[in-house]
Amino acid sequence: MQRLLAPARRVLQVKRAMQETSLTPAHLLSAAQQRFSTIPPAPLAKTDTWPKDVGILALEVYFPAQYVDQTDLEKFNNVEAGKYTVGLGQTRMGFCSVQEDINSLCLTVVQRLMERTKLPWDAVGRLEVGTETIIDKSKAVKTVLMELFQDSGNTDIEGIDTTNACYGGTASLFNAANWMESSYWDGRYALVVCGDIAVYPSGNARPTGGAGAVAMLIGPKAPLVLEQGLRGTHMENAYDFYKPNLASEYPLVDGKLSIQCYLRALDRCYAAYRKKIQNQWKQAGNNQPFTLDDVQYMIFHTPFCKMVQKSLARLMFNDFLSSSSDKQNNLYKGLEAFRGLKLEETYTNKDVDKALLKASLDMFNQKTKASLYLSTNNGNMYTSSLYGCLASLLSHHSAQELAGSRIGAFSYGSGLAASFFSFRVSKDASPGSPLEKLVSSVSDLPKRLDSRRRMSPEEFTEIMNQREQFYHKVNFSPPGDTSNLFPGTWYLERVDEMHRRKYARCPV
């Protein structure tokens, strides 16, 4: 029977026992844990070694209950057929009414995760939120989520909001892992929550919106392990996408610059990651170069799906340029003409793009395409986009197919901050294993997406107008019928004259 660590007060008792007795870690663990059905045991107290296999134990995805079809938007906006569905690679776009805001999205996804896993609320020692959807310049989303912990009496929870465009979720994940592998870890689990509402003014950018949230339970002995020492990061100052107008939800976007920044960050993060993993291999006696062949699956931050296909092709181009002439001729047919180019010379080269997309198509279909299911059908979720891709990947493969694989991940946030990192999937795919349970938990993703209501472009536009009208308005209750929300969804019930927000939950 699976077990779970005890409340915080029990942690203190065990630490005292450590000082008074010579109990081994195994004795401490069995004395301090309680039975639990879906999450594997975690070591309780810090020892002289790292907690083993820190990573993602459980994952929950939330998206709004309505969407607009991109083919309908193409007709409504009088653009050529395929501009959104082919040019951007988008099929549907989820969106929120005035009844939902970033607080309600995060309340919903955390509550769902905790209820599904049956995790006691006092078993969480860190909760961090990654978001760029700011409705208060001072009060963090994390503070609103503390309402969920009130009945448990658990207020000893570290972490706060982290913001830098779409990168905040990844920064929160890294912070959770760092906490767990530090002297400050008290033996409890961490929750990482990332969510956003991506909206744009009417025009070319509006079809690249979306909305959603992802919650991840972080702990040791995870089925998706963050590979230690393997992060390649790039940061710089850029004005590719930013939100200086605090009176509006809408960003300012330099589209061409943003694509160049994304690709440049990808190049540099991949180079840094490759250097670190090759150093690890060299220390182990392996002098082989790292390439995409060493990654079984690859997921990306997804502003729109076509960008991801270009990004995988870009990684192949990095491998091509760093390989020997013999390998270039044998493994990368069709790219020989670009052998003498430098990476920075190719960001806007359409001939290079076309050749790379063709050369990498099979690899894209094998490693990445399945990860785009949620993005294709719901749009850009900003901080939760990358982790929605992870959920999509898990939902389209069996535990047996995933077991033992490496999942590469690229996270990007405008402004800019980016990282390339990786997960190592557990080799245990047996029935009832943590990996099998994790995969099963997201297997209903396609069914849930299909259960949403299809709204017309006219209805979508009206709701966008309402969001503009009520943004930062006070003393009002949002219009709309809460029966249209998914069961168990938290929603904004009222904003009073002092901007204080009250939330309620739909019946489960």
Curated annotation (Swiss-Prot):
Q: Which domain of life is it from?
A: Eukaryota
Q: Where is the active site?
A: E132, C166, H301
Query: Where are residues bearing Phosphoserine located in the sequence?
Result: S433, S440, S456, S477
GO (cellular component) term, any one: mitochondrion
Family annotation (Pfam families): HMG_CoA_synt_C, HMG_CoA_synt_N
Q: Which InterPro entries does the annotation name? A: HMG_CoA_synt_AS, HMG_CoA_synt_C_dom, HMG_CoA_synth_N, HMG_CoA_synthase_euk, Thiolase-like
Annotated disulfide bonds: none
Top enzyme category: transferase
Lipid metabolism in keyword set:
yes
Query: So where does (3S)-3-hydroxy-3-methylglutaryl-CoA get bound?
Result: E80, A81, C166, N204, T208, S258, H301, K310, N380, S414
Identify residues that carry N6-acetyllysine: 83, 118, 243, 256, 306, 310, 327, 342, 350, 354, 358, 427, 437, 447, 473
- Keyword annotations for this protein? Acetylation, Cholesterol biosynthesis, Cholesterol metabolism, Lipid biosynthesis, Lipid metabolism, Mitochondrion, Phosphoprotein, Steroid biosynthesis, Steroid metabolism, Sterol biosynthesis, Sterol metabolism, Transferase, Transit peptide
Q: Where does the protein end up?
A: Mitochondrion
For molecular function, the Gene Ontology terms on record are: hydroxymethylglutaryl-CoA synthase activity; identical protein binding
Define the transit peptide region by residue numbers.
1-37
Its pathway is:
Metabolic intermediate biosynthesis; (R)-mevalonate biosynthesis; (R)-mevalonate from acetyl-CoA: step 2/3
Query: Which reactions does this protein catalyse?
Result: acetoacetyl-CoA + acetyl-CoA + H2O = (3S)-3-hydroxy-3-methylglutaryl-CoA + CoA + H(+)
Q: Does the keyword Oxidoreductase apply?
A: no
Q: What tissue specificity does the UniProt entry give?
A: Liver and kidney.
Changing K83E: reported impact?
Abolishes enzymatic activity
Q: Which residues carry this modification: N6-succinyllysine?
A: K52, K83, K118, K221, K256, K310, K327, K333, K342, K350, K354, K358, K447, K473
What family is this?
Belongs to the thiolase-like superfamily. HMG-CoA synthase family.
PANTHER family tied to this protein: 3-HYDROXY-3-METHYLGLUTARYL COENZYME A SYNTHASE, HYDROXYMETHYLGLUTARYL-COA SYNTHASE, MITOCHONDRIAL
Task: Report the protein's function.
Answer: Catalyzes the first irreversible step in ketogenesis, condensing acetyl-CoA to acetoacetyl-CoA to form HMG-CoA, which is converted by HMG-CoA reductase (HMGCR) into mevalonate.
Binding partners and assembly: Homodimer.
Protein name from the UniProt record = Hydroxymethylglutaryl-CoA synthase, mitochondrial
Q: Organism, per UniProt?
A: Mus musculus
